């Protein structure tokens, strides 16, 4: 059995999956805010409950917001104060008496999609999140690629490509990013970026859902705005795909539900790739809110 924990700022969700990758049991509890001992105890209790339900000791995988440090599993996450700076992986492995694997929630999202029954045919899968921020994960042969510093897939912190100036204009401000740099694509491609660009070009203040509603109502500014955003997405994907060359790109996050983004996306991207390169398949994420715990559980699967 495979146990997947999705630990967020407000809740801990546990899903138990069988050998066929089917969800057979789940629980949810509140995340202890500032008490590390309570956090360990909550995970321990849920694990024991799952063991009791299954009649066997399952494997444990955990997805967290933030970046686990590759060397020792120390957690750096603003959303889980109780775990910040703690060696969660080592402490839980000792407490539970089994190997615990931890990865960030974006990698777990990508892993969940890569293990979809249909998507398993693709050796290299890129999960890209277009939500409050921009992030993602790279899956190769059923395993997340993490790199030296666990920053593989931090797509939002790539800088605007030169071709973006053609789309947005040479006077576009290089927005400051929370990472301390300027001009990161997250500032323009995220849901907040979608709204910021709307305000920048049209001096109107609306949320992304409101702009999308206007698009479907035929608002001319919303139509033009969506066209500009689609071209910007294609430009940014051109750099990412040239570097990673995935077979499949799965889009998640709130903006991934905007059907218009997929219109002609392959053709748009093709013009930003090498002449010999074919675009990957683009799909919307299929596993929704369950992706975090599902992907965490699958950290123990073998391709």
From Swiss-Prot:
Keywords: ATP-binding, Carbohydrate metabolism, Kinase, Metal-binding, Nucleotide-binding, Transferase, Zinc. Pfam families: ROK (PF00480). PROSITE patterns: ROK (PS01125). GO terms for biological process: N-acetylglucosamine metabolic process; peptidoglycan turnover. The keyword Metal-binding applies. Pathway: Cell wall biogenesis; peptidoglycan recycling. ATP binds at residues 4-11, 133-140. PANTHER family: N-ACETYL-D-GLUCOSAMINE KINASE, ROK (REPRESSOR, ORF, KINASE) FAMILY. This is N-acetyl-D-glucosamine kinase. The gene is nagK.
């Amino acid at each position: 059995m495979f146990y997947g924990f999705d630990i967020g700022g407000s809740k801990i969700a546990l899903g138990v999956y069988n050998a066929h990758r089917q969800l057979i049991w789940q629980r949810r509890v509140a995340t202890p805010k500032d008490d590390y001992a309570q956090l360990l105890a909550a995970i321990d209790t849920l694990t024991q409950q799952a063991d009791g339900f299954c009649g066997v000791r399952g494997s444990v995988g955990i997805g967290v917001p933030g970046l686990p440090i590759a060397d020792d599993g120390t957690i750096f996450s603003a959303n889980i104060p109780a775990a910040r700076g703690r060696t969660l992986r080592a402490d839980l492995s000792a407490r539970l008496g089994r190997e615990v694997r931890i990865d960030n929630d974006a990698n777990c999202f990508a892993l969940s999609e890569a293990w979809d029954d249909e998507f398993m045919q693709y050796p290299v899968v890129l999960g890209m999140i277009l939500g409050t921020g921009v992030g993602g994960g790279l899956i190769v042969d059923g395993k997340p690629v993490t790199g030296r510093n666990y920053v593989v897939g931090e797509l939002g912190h790539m800088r605007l490509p030169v071709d973006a100036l053609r789309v947005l204009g040479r006077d576009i401000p290089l927005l400051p990013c929370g990472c301390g740099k300027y001009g990161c694509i997250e500032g323009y491609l995220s849901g907040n970026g979608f709204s910021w660009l709307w305000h920048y070009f049209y001096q109107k203040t609306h949320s992304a859902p409101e702009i999308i509603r206007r698009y479907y109502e035929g608002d001319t500014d919303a139509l033009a705005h969506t066209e500009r955003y689609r071209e910007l997405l294609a430009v940014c994907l051109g750099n990412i795909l040239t570097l990673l060359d995935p077979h499949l790109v799965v889009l998640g996050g709130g903006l991934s539900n905007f059907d218009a983004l997929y219109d002609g996306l392959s053709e748009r991207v093709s013009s930003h790739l090498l002449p010999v390169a074919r675009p990957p398949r683009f799909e919307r994420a299929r596993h929704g809110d369950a992706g975090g715990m599902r992907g965490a559980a699958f950290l123990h699967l073998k391709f």
